[in-house]
Amino acid sequence: MKTDLVNKINQSTAHRKSRVYLSNYIIRHEELLNEFISIAFDIQNENHVKAFWSLEFVCEKKLKLFTPYLDLFCEVLPKIKDDSAVRPATKICMFLAKSNHRKNGISLSQEQEHHLIEALIDRLIQDEKVASKVYAMKALFVLGKKYDWVHEELKTIIEQDYANHTAAYQAATRNLLKKLNK
């Protein structure tokens, strides 16, 4: 028998309104977060992608709810293959990197930072959609403020790939390259 949460995830769609509704439901019912995260992180689960769609909004609104799951997220991140889950996962990485950089934000351990950096660099090198690559670049740029070598690696990857990508990718990377060249 499916739980109420599983039914809600199953009924959700890619439409923003649906994803926001489910994320608000999870925020209001924090006791369901563990089950929700388990579904999102189980890449064999038929609802894994749908759960990730709404997890992005949970993290955008209440990132601190996600902190107990950071180690597990770092473990699952490189294993995510479905493009529809990769995009929200890389966006969550961006939220984590930005929050980690703020004084009153969440604190990632050095090991978590290294796991994120490794997974994000892999995403840039792999054949991913532009949105996923842009979120990965933004997260790496922030993480590179602490680890200088990350900026050098990011710059090298962007410059090598620049001519081979779409106009959308080139537009997104142009400003980042300017910041990296300062």
Q: Whereabouts are the PLM-identified features?
A:
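Alpha-helical scaffold domains
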Residues: 1-182
